[in-house]
Amino acid sequence: MLGALGALAWPLAAGAAATGWRDTSWGETTQELGQQFGAAGTRLVRPIDFGDSYADLVLKNYDVGGYGFIVFFQMDKRTHGLKRIQIERGRHGAVPEVAQAAFDALVASYGPPTVACSVRAHTIDAQSLVEEVWQRDGTTVRALFREASLNTLDPYLARAVGDFVTGSTAAGLSQQLLIRIAPAGTEPEDCRARK
């Protein structure tokens, strides 16, 4: 479990542009990242658009807390250099048990978060939110879990490549479990009003 996250842990690698994750640096090109990760990296024929960035290289089945995640190397559309790293669990696998394992693994690696919040949904069309943020040495690590609130059982609850998690969760609204690593000051803070 911590083997994969051990690569996330501070202190940051030498150099002002270090991301603090697996010896990567802000501004690296897809080609440089591809050389670093070799066969573990998958080049995408069609890049995924993230608005201000795109991902044309991913790592599949990256272990966080004992579960497989996908790592998206988000490249700046203007400079084509590494802008942020997003580590995301597939939507059907983004369930409370997996979220708890991921948050526990992050706390084991980084210690207590700098900022944390939890907001429970109070209406049928809202989503509950759990967010934890670590800020160190010019880098922000943000873990976010949005859970749907409709009280219906999804029969395909947590089916994902390589594992199956049982339990109950809401269905109807898309769930989300992700970890974003970015330069400090570049990430939105859903917890801002509740600090």
Show which residues each predicted segment covers:
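N-terminal signal peptide c-region/cleavage motif recognized by signal peptidases
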Residues: 9-14
